C-alpha cells in the first residue's frame, strides 16, 4: 500500500462524514462536499477516522488509494478550516475591487476586466492591490486564483502583473547593446 494511504484521515469535531457505497459526503461549518470514490478503493469509517485500502493489489489500485486519501483529507480540511489563495497586483494603476458577485480588475488594458465569482468561492480585496480567494474546495480555489492570474501573468522584465503572494518572479536582464 502507498505511504500516503497508510495514514488514516482524522475527522475533527464539527465535521460529519457519511459513506454510502463508494460515495462520500462531508459536512462542516464551512460547507459541504460530496465525491464518488473509485471502485478499486474501499473506505472504512471507525470512530473519528477514515481508512483506505485497495480492493486488489494492482499498481493502479494502490496509486488510486493514495490519491483518494489525499482528496478526502482535502475535503475534510476544506469544510472545517477552508482554503485560501492570496494574489498581489504589481504595476502602475493595477487595482482590484469586488462589486456584488463580480471582481473588477484594472490591469493596464484599454478596458476593465470583469470576473464573475463562481458559487462556492468568496473573493475579498483587503487593499486595492490584494485579492484573497477563499473556499472549501481546494481545487476550485486554485482554479479561480489561476484564472485571475491568467489575465495578466507577471512579465519577466519588470515583474508587472498578477502574481501569487508567495511567488518569486525571477527577473531577466534587459538586452544590452
Swiss-Prot record:
Query: Per the record's keyword annotation, is DNA damage included, yes or no?
Result: no
Tell me the Gene Ontology biological-process terms attached to this UniProt entry. Answer: cytoplasmic translation
Q: Which SUPFAM superfamilies match?
A: Ribosomal protein L6
Q: Give a GO molecular function annotation for the protein.
A: rRNA binding
UniProt key word Nuclease: no
- Pfam families attached to this UniProt entry: Ribosomal_L6
Query: Cellular component GO terms, alphabetically?
Result: cytosolic large ribosomal subunit
Which UniProt keywords are given for this protein, alphabetically ordered?
Ribonucleoprotein, Ribosomal protein, RNA-binding, rRNA-binding
State the family named in the UniProt similarity comment for this chain.
Belongs to the universal ribosomal protein uL6 family.
Q: How does it assemble?
A: Part of the 50S ribosomal subunit.
Return the NCBIfam families for the record: L6_bact
This molecule's function is given as: This protein binds to the 23S rRNA, and is important in its secondary structure. It is located near the subunit interface in the base of the L7/L12 stalk, and near the tRNA binding site of the peptidyltransferase center.
Protein's UniProt name: Large ribosomal subunit protein uL6
Native organism is Halorhodospira halophila (strain DSM 244 / SL1) (Ectothiorhodospira halophila (strain DSM 244 / SL1))
Q: Which gene is transcribed and translated to give this protein? A: rplF
Amino acid at each position: 500500500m502507498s505511504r500516503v494511504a497508510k495514514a488514516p484521515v482524522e475527522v475533527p469535531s464539527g465535521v460529519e462524514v457519511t459513506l454510502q457505497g463508494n460515495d462520500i459526503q462531508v459536512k462542516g461549518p464551512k460547507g459541504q462536499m460530496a465525491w464518488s470514490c473509485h471502485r478499486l478503493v474501499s473506505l472504512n469509517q471507525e470512530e473519528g477516522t477514515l481508512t483506505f485500502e485497495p480492493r486488489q493489489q494492482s499498481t493502479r489500485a494502490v496509486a488510486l488509494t493514495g490519491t483518494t486519501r489525499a482528496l478526502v483529507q482535502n475535503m475534510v480540511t476544506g469544510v472545517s478550516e477552508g482554503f485560501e489563495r492570496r494574489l498581489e497586483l504589481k504595476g502602475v494603476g493595477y487595482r482590484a475591487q469586488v462589486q456584488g458577485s463580480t471582481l473588477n480588475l484594472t490591469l493596464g488594458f484599454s478596458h476593465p476586466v470583469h470576473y464573475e465569482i463562481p458559487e462556492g468561492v468568496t473573493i475579498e480585496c483587503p487593499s486595492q492591490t490584494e485579492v484573497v480567494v477563499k473556499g472549501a474546495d481546494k481545487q476550485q480555489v486554485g482554479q479561480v486564483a489561476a484564472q485571475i492570474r491568467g489575465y495578466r501573468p507577471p512579465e519577466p522584465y519588470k515583474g508587472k502583473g498578477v502574481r501569487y503572494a508567495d511567488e518569486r518572479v525571477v527577473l531577466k536582464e534587459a538586452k544590452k547593446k
